[in-house]
Curated annotation (Swiss-Prot):
It comes from Buchnera aphidicola subsp. Acyrthosiphon pisum (strain Tuc7). Pfam families: RRF. This is Ribosome-recycling factor. SUPFAM superfamilies: Ribosome recycling factor, RRF (SSF55194). Keywords: Cytoplasm, Protein biosynthesis. InterPro entries: Ribosome_recyc_fac, Ribosome_recyc_fac_dom, RRF_sf. The lineage of its organism: Bacteria, Pseudomonadati, Pseudomonadota, Gammaproteobacteria, Enterobacterales. GO terms for molecular function: ribosomal large subunit binding. Its main location: cytoplasm. One of its GO terms (biological process) is cytoplasmic translational termination.
Length: 185
């Protein structure tokens, strides 16, 4: 029973880390990366299709992305989707390809982005702590129902705390890496 709580807690904490990682990966650092466009979808044959399924996204240089579109008829749809994506990108049609220059970040914008990612990191830490609280409550309920002993309760809560510290440390590492990436350029 306790093992199931530990496994479920680890899964939930891992999902929280993954969500945080995905969120900050979508933040532009002033450097070209295909992941910038991973959340772009276009209407293709009546359904929303990810951009990466209808094209190749290539990094031309550190400040330019190039999109090789498989079907010429959707080039303008892709351009429109990128313009409407709130990514502040200005795609340029060049034959059947789309060129996307990535603007350099100003110092002020970098500081704003760092505040945003620090806020996301704190929200993720709070989620991890809430997951810990939920797990500890389940363990206490098992003790109250006399399914486990007090020793098992203390051992389980120690494991949960170690797990919590581990995942908060992961959040801090991801945050530190992203801050360095933002300040590099």
């Amino acid at each position: 029973m306790i093992n199931q709580i530990d496994i479920k807690t680890r899964e939930r904490m891992e999902a929280c880390i993954q969500t945080f990682h995905n969120n900050i990966n979508n933040i532009k650092t002033g450097r070209a990366s295909p992941t910038l466009l991973h959340n772009i979808y276009i209407e293709y044959f009546g359904s929303k299709t990810p951009l990466r399924q209808v094209s190749n996204i290539i990094v031309e240089d550190s400040h330019t992305l190039k999109i090789n579109v498989f079907d010429d008829s959707i080039t303008s749809l892709i351009r429109k989707s990128i313009l409407n994506s709130n990514l502040d990108l200005n795609p340029v049609l060049q034959g059947k390809d789309i060129i996307i220059p990535i603007p350099r970040l100003t110092e002020e914008r970098r500081k704003q982005l760092i505040k945003v990612i620090r806020g996301d990191a704190e929200s993720s830490r709070i989620q991890i702590r809430n997951i810990r609280r939920d797990a500890n409550d389940k363990v206490k309920r098992l003790l109250k129902d006399k399914i486990i002993s007090e020793d098992n309760e203390h051992t389980s809560q120690s494991k949960i705390q170690i797990m919590t510290n581990e995942y908060i440390k992961k959040i801090d590492c991801i945050l530190e890496k992203k801050e360095k990436e933002l300040m590099k350029f």
